[in-house]
From Swiss-Prot:
GO cellular component: a single term: nucleus
Annotated keywords: DNA-binding, Metal-binding, Nucleus, Repeat, Transcription, Transcription regulation, Zinc, Zinc-finger
Species name: Danio rerio (Zebrafish)
Gene encoding the protein: znf511
Disordered, as annotated region: 225-244
Iron-sulfur found in the keyword field: no
Family in the record: Belongs to the krueppel C2H2-type zinc-finger protein family.
Protein name: Zinc finger protein 511
Start and end residues, zinc fingers (C2H2-type): 96-121, 123-146, 160-185
Length: 277
């Protein structure tokens, strides 16, 4: 704010106050600049333009200074509790069945169905209907099981990839890969990913089928012979003394073919009745 002498000197046309009598105000900027220079020079008597002195204050726990903060904190915690209580429960839905044909799994939540579908139905081989937990394992399975050129290429180079993602090692045989998985990646010893050999089961099935076919043929022959009133004599072979061999032996029959039945090229058609003379 200007001093009254300066206002009178500026406002009147004929000022009665001389300019030299006007008081000159102190330049604060110059004074502050001088103080800053003294402080930089390291003089201890440098006076700060501020009279504020920092002072540590201590308050009790129940002081009024913390009252507003305690109220806000209490309201904040109360809102959190009420928000947890007011959270709406997920809507309950009736049980539904998996839409994949042949799967009878029931679900009451959408999350359970998504987990089931991703684990069992997302990565499924279209040839053998096997399911895999990841797309990479499915691709390796298709390459090793259903690619006709895989075995030819495996004889020339390493084709069996490691099943762990990020491990790019390849092996000559599936046994080497299995040993690598057990030793390096701590897979269980009974882990199996390669194609299983079913030679024994296939042989047993073929043997059983042959036995069944032989029994059917024998039963058919016996029925035909009984219908034609054929005479036969039962001549069982002598039974050996050993019990194990006697259990495995079966009685053999020798048949007498009637004169009305012929076999061989150029003969009369079999099972034809005699011509009347």
């Amino acid at each position: 704010m200007l001093q009254p002498e300066i206002i009178e000197f500026l406002a009147s046309t004929t000022p009665q106050i001389l300019a030299k009598n006007i008081p000159v105000t102190e330049n604060r900027e110059s004074k502050r600049h001088d103080i800053q220079q003294k402080a930089e020079a390291g003089e201890e008597k440098a006076v700060s333009p501020f009279e504020f002195r920092p002072q540590r204050l201590r308050f009790a726990v129940e002081d009024e200074y913390f009252e507003d903060g305690d109220i806000n904190r209490h309201m904040y915690l109360q809102n959190i509790v009420t928000s947890f209580v007011d959270d709406k429960q997920p809507p309950t839905i009736s049980e539904f069945r998996c839409h994949i044909a042949g799967c009878k799994q029931l679900f009451d939540t959408l999350e359970g169905y998504e987990h089931h579908y991703n684990a069992l139905h997302r990565n499924v081989c279209s040839n053998c209907k096997r399911s895999f937990p990841s797309n990479r394992l499915l691709e390796i399975h298709i390459l090793e099981w259903h690619d006709s050129l895989f075995q030819i290429m495996a004889e020339k180079q390493c084709m069996y990839e490691c099943l762990v993602e990020g491990c790019g090692l390849k092996f000559k045989t599936s046994k080497e890969r299995k040993d690598h998985l057990i030793r390096t990646h701590s897979y269980p010893a009974d882990f199996r990913f390669d194609k299983s050999k079913k030679i024994g089961r296939t042989t047993e099935k073929k043997t059983q089928q042959k036995k069944d076919a032989h029994m059917e043929v024998s039963a058919t022959v016996l029925q035909q012979e009984s219908s034609e009133s054929m005479d036969f004599s039962l001549t069982p072979e002598p039974v050996e003394t050993e019990p194990m061999q006697a259990a495995n032996l079966k009685p053999r029959y020798s048949y007498k073919v009637p004169s009305s039945i012929c076999f061989g090229q150029g003969s009369v058609r079999g099972f034809r009745g005699r011509r009347k003379k």
